């Protein structure tokens, strides 16, 4: 099997941070070479843009925000993702372009056609081989975000914003079931872990 590009995504409060540890443990048990990274971020340029994008004080228009996301992504692809895959290393990214369709598209209202243009220009033919989409009901997401001590620029948004974000995620998953695995992360930790491990086992033929 060629090196796999796997993404982990979902609305805020879906449990990505917790379940990244599950994925790391799965790769470690099998001794598979893997690189973990994140978006926006993963490179010095990406991390600098991340600080701007998540800072509640940042006043950026929708197009500027979207372009910053893709600027960080282009650097990420060129400096991190493609080199790792070329070296035979699997890559797991905490968020990727699905998040742009969901947050800037669904949440903010950026036309999906415009995002697709940037997607093709920045990524070429690069697409994830597998996307683990963590999903929780809106009220669970909002409750978990509410427990965050300091909310970032996106976490400060209202429920209707996250409702639109979640809808885009689920619609994209329904339209391409061969790439997406929707994980109910409102279940107990053990159940969520088992679900993720089963998806990875199946994907890698374990």
Swiss-Prot record:
Quote the catalytic activity from the record.
dTMP + ATP = dTDP + ADP
Positions that bind ATP? 10-17
Say which enzyme class the record assigns: transferase
Record keywords: ATP-binding, Kinase, Nucleotide biosynthesis, Nucleotide-binding, Transferase
List, alphabetically, the CDD domains matched.
Answer: TMPK
Q: Name one GO biological process term.
A: dTDP biosynthetic process
Q: Which domain of life is it from?
A: Bacteria
Q: Which InterPro entries match?
A: P-loop_NTPase, Thymidylate_kin-like_dom, Thymidylate_kinase
Homology family:
Belongs to the thymidylate kinase family.
Q: Which HAMAP family does the record match to this protein?
A: Thymidylate_kinase
Name of the protein:
Thymidylate kinase
Q: Which organism is it from?
A: Neisseria meningitidis serogroup A / serotype 4A (strain DSM 15465 / Z2491)
């Amino acid at each position: 099997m060629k090196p796999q590009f796997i993404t982990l995504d979902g609305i805020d409060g879906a449990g990505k941070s917790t379940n990244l540890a599950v994925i790391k443990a799965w790769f470690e048990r099998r001794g598979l070479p893997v690189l973990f990274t994140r978006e926006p971020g993963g490179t010095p340029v990406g991390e600098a843009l991340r600080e701007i994008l998540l800072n509640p004080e940042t006043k950026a228009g929708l197009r500027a925000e979207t372009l910053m996301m893709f600027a960080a992504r282009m650097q990420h692809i060129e400096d991190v993702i493609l080199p790792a895959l070329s070296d035979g290393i699997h890559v797991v990214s905490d968020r990727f372009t699905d998040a742009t369709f969901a947050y800037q598209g669904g949440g903010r209202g950026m036309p999906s056609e415009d995002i697709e243009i940037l997607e093709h220009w920045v990524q070429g033919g690069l697409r994830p081989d597998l996307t683990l989409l963590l999903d929780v009901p809106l009220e669970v997401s909002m409750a978990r975000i509410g427990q965050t001590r300091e909310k970032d620029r996106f976490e400060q948004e209202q429920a209707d914003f996250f409702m639109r974000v979640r809808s885009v995620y689920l619609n994209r998953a329904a339209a391409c079931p061969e790439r997406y695995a929707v994980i109910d992360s409102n279940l107990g930790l053990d159940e969520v872990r088992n679900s993720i491990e089963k998806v990875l086992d199946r994907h890698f033929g374990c």
